[in-house]
């Protein structure tokens, strides 16, 4: 019996190895395999948004002017969602709706699906980029895990919510004022601010801002070696060979302030990761629930009593009336295809009126 000792050798011109060597080469801007997804999708998403906000009207889908060409500014320009009649069509340029006509494709709202889908894959590509780089330099993948929070929010709001409704029409358009309109829509039709998942999202984002402010201030406060530079920011010298702040001093300070404090840096920084990411995940779950038209808190007993007793009113019943007003005033403008008309006498008014 013959035993061959040695290493299996591949063909020197193996295509995969050649691509891997080029993609993962050490350069100023890392490309990587994730870059094959990230860079094209990000380019098309951003380019599509600039094209839409600069040149494309929303007259045929929303009855609105939405581009710089029509007189909008940065706050009012948008890439608008397709009309409700197009339902969940991908609106491909070569599809049955546009039939290869670029102008018609833009008029139908094809740029919105183009930007939304390329944007989603671009964000996923950016997360994969963080995974790939972390693996290359032997880091843990927590940066990528943290970035899954914004991805979850984007996908739930721009893709899953309209998929649960009758069409892409009910997703947010890509613009500043358009997002504000969508927030009003969410409040009026879903009572979103009283949803516990929204509450967790707000607690996560604002809690993270508080944690960042406290953490940054504490580190600056406990510096014990500022370096020997003459300028005001000598503490920011990046060439110091070791840490120059005191965790022990910080622990003692916050123990006196709150009675409790983080005892080690790992738990502290994990908590700073956990709070915002969990908040974003929870808010994304809440939006998925809204896609299915699930209701959160409906205090029916208060509504019944308010209907029976003109003098009984709570902040909850006042908010319900506000939501009815939002629905009534938005529906006629926001859903022109329904030809909704609300006479003055049916618009909601508070008990005091």
Swiss-Prot record:
Residues noted as binding chlorophyll a ChlzD2 in the record, renumbered to the chain: 118
Coarse class of the protein's main subcellular location: plastid
One MF annotation (Gene Ontology) recorded for this entry: electron transporter, transferring electrons within the cyclic electron transport pathway of photosynthesis activity
GO BP term (any one): photosynthetic electron transport in photosystem II
One Gene Ontology CC term in the entry: photosystem II
Localization of this protein: Plastid, Chloroplast thylakoid membrane
Modified residues (Phosphothreonine): 2
EC number(s) stated in the UniProt entry for this protein: 1.10.3.9
Keyword vocabulary terms for this entry: Acetylation, Chlorophyll, Chloroplast, Chromophore, Electron transport, Iron, Magnesium, Membrane, Metal-binding, Oxidoreductase, Phosphoprotein, Photosynthesis, Photosystem II, Plastid, Thylakoid, Transmembrane, Transmembrane helix, Transport
Record-listed Fe cation binding positions: 215, 269
Record has Transmembrane helix as a keyword: yes
Comment on bound cofactor: The D1/D2 heterodimer binds P680, chlorophylls that are the primary electron donor of PSII, and subsequent electron acceptors. It shares a non-heme iron and each subunit binds pheophytin, quinone, additional chlorophylls, carotenoids and lipids. There is also a Cl(-1) ion associated with D1 and D2, which is required for oxygen evolution. The PSII complex binds additional chlorophylls, carotenoids and specific lipids.
Substrates-to-products reaction catalysed: 2 a plastoquinone + 4 hnu + 2 H2O = 2 a plastoquinol + O2
N-acetylthreonine: residues bearing it: 2
Positions contributing to pheophytin a binding: 130, 143
TM region positions: 41-61, 125-141, 153-166, 208-228, 279-295
Top-tier EC class: oxidoreductase
Family according to the record: Belongs to the reaction center PufL/M/PsbA/D family.
HAMAP family linked to this entry: PSII_PsbD_D2
Oligomer and partners: PSII is composed of 1 copy each of membrane proteins PsbA, PsbB, PsbC, PsbD, PsbE, PsbF, PsbH, PsbI, PsbJ, PsbK, PsbL, PsbM, PsbT, PsbX, PsbY, PsbZ, Psb30/Ycf12, at least 3 peripheral proteins of the oxygen-evolving complex and a large number of cofactors. It forms dimeric complexes.
Free-text function comment from the UniProt entry: Photosystem II (PSII) is a light-driven water:plastoquinone oxidoreductase that uses light energy to abstract electrons from H(2)O, generating O(2) and a proton gradient subsequently used for ATP formation. It consists of a core antenna complex that captures photons, and an electron transfer chain that converts photonic excitation into a charge separation. The D1/D2 (PsbA/PsbD) reaction center heterodimer binds P680, the primary electron donor of PSII as well as several subsequent electron acceptors. D2 is needed for assembly of a stable PSII complex.
Designated name of the protein: Photosystem II D2 protein
The organism of origin for this protein: Ipomoea purpurea
Gene: psbD
